Amino acid sequence: MRKLTIPFNVFIDTEFTDFLDPQLVSIGLVVQSGEEFYAELPYELRECSEFVKAAVLPLLGYAPHAEMTKDDLYLQMNNWLRLVRPKDQEVFVCYDYQTDWDLFYDVLDGRVPPWCKRRLVADRINELLRYEFHKKNNLPEHHALNDARANCYAFRELPSSSTAVPGG
């Protein structure tokens, strides 16, 4: 009998300067069991789009100890991933937008631990549940940690064909 393993998902979200040349502004990581990581990086205001200036930047600066350099972020995020990872288990880094993965990869300088697997989950995020999460918890969107939390809450695993019951 094969042991059923539940995927260990880490949901990530990022906020960045603009779509043309995205530079990381903040990153949030959330595990379904409740562990969280959040960081904010220095940014150049002139590189930020008008949308980012209006919707993202006003939400920054409220989390104690979140501001750090990119080097510190590399160390702290790597340590956090190692701490939350179940023993000898793969970690699925779940993202709903390609730039989130690209910026995560960039923070790790391309040295993503071999036990971290990327997983695009945009088609598994229930948008109504995501909206409900923000409203119910009175948390604004376009904040990396809030959005990672919302994605974790709204994520629904699609049934796998190997576990489907015929005629059921």
Predicted regions and their residues:
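Acidic, Mg2+-coordinating catalytic module of metal-dependent nucleases/exonucleases
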Residues: 94-97, 133-168
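Short, surface-exposed basic-aromatic patches at helix termini and helix-loop junctions that form
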Residues: 30-31, 109-113, 160
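Charged, flexible boundary elements
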Residues: 1-2
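Substrate-recognition/cap helix-loop segment adjacent to the acidic, metal-dependent catalytic center
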Residues: 99-118
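Conserved non-catalytic scaffold segment of RNase H-like nuclease domains
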Residues: 5-95
